[in-house]
């Protein structure tokens, strides 16, 4: 009986060691370290299509329909927050600003925090579901690219994600 148990323990150890599972969140969040371009939809009462990119240290979030504004800047004053370019000023509602900040946070997740990583297969697609401090990121197990984010009551579905060369 002891031999069977020992054999079973050795076999299980072999299976665990041979699994192709990433080292941890540092590897799973590696896409955050380089330049990328992403198309996503922020769900909610009013879904917003977004283009999100990283160039160097900057993360640029452009809502669909804002292309005509060109080089825009966020301006904060006593009346609130605005997106401005030249003479064009568009007031951002508090909820819109909070939603954009949540999107930014989704692309600057901290791999050093304690994460709970589980493997799932919804619809036959292998993914890693990673949860920490109210943030959840779903990562494709084959490409190690993000598929969906959830944070602060917001859901961001990634439609397209490309790493820069």
Predicted regions and their residues:
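Flexible, processing/modification-adjacent segments and terminal tails
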Residues: 23-37, 82-134
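Short, hydrophobic/proline-enriched secondary-structure or compact coil segments at domain edges
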Residues: 37-39, 80-81, 145-151
